[in-house]
Amino acid sequence: MDAQKMKMVIGLVLVATTAFALMIPAASAVDDFITRRAYDNLVKSGAIKDIPVMAKTIISNPVLEEGMLTYYTNKKLGDSAISCGETCFKFKCYTPRCSCSYPVCK
């Protein structure tokens, strides 16, 4: 195999490896979200300052919010009501008076 073809093969392998490596985190990511109502409660209570970096996705569309809450209710917790409107990805709830019942705060 000449040098030009060898460089092309190595380049293709590097591109494929990089593309695969970039897809793994996206495929294994867990959505960590908070509803607009829960976020507003955090701001009003002053507890927002206790969160070092807001890494949650704020859901402000009522239809999308209801869909996410329904998904988590049906998939993980049966027919439980979700009162806090926040997921607890790292087993911590920021909304006051809520505790983690993975994957959502109650």
From Swiss-Prot:
Propeptide segments, given as residue ranges: 30-79
Top-level taxon: Eukaryota
Name the UniProt record assigns to this protein: Violacin-A
Record function comment: Probably participates in a plant defense mechanism. Has low hemolytic activity.
Keywords for this protein: Cytolysis, Disulfide bond, Hemolysis, Knottin, Plant defense, Signal
UniProt-listed GO biological process terms: defense response; killing of cells of another organism
Signal peptide boundaries: 1-29
Record family assignment: Belongs to the cyclotide family. Moebius subfamily.
InterPro entries, sorted: Cyclotide, Cyclotide_sf
Domain observations: The presence of a 'disulfide through disulfide knot' structurally defines this protein as a knottin.
Statement: the UniProt record of this protein carries the keyword Disulfide bond: yes
Classification via Pfam families: Cyclotide
Disulfide bonds: C84-C98, C88-C100, C93-C105
Additional note from the record: The presence of a premature stop codon inhibits the translation of a key Asn residue that is thought to be required for cyclization.
Post-translational modification: Violacin-A is not a cyclic peptide.
